[in-house]
Amino acid sequence: MTPLVQAEFWDGDPDIDAICRLSKKPIVKFKHFEPFTTYQLTPFNSQNTFLHRSVLKYYSVFPYTGRMDDIWGAYVMQYHFPNSVLFNKATVYQARNPQDLVKNLENEVIGYRNTLNLLNNLKDYMSLLPEKTVEYFNIYQKYFN
């Protein structure tokens, strides 16, 4: 496995979905662990994450996708570079800014409705992303040619 993405965890107030935040209100403190990877497709956060230059053309935080922006970007990157994500211990503490959890939930509905279809048909991701997201990603990728 050649790690091209190193996603480091964070202690404190995690970036989780609104349902979990509303029901659990977690504050986390991770115990020390060794870096790990998986051969499964996995989301990773855009925060506290290091990317090798070779993946930059294929990874972006996608606009017009609600709160799926970094999650769907991570899946698309892994379509092009499978088995390339390494997870590491927490190296930062996150104190989240105040948020409207109902608005967050509304912005997550696109994911509840479309993520499984995206994962099952990842090779066709350009036809599954919102039209404005595809327009953006095409422009973004031109800067790497």
Name what the model sees in each region.
Residues 2-145:
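C-terminal catalytic/acceptor-binding lobe
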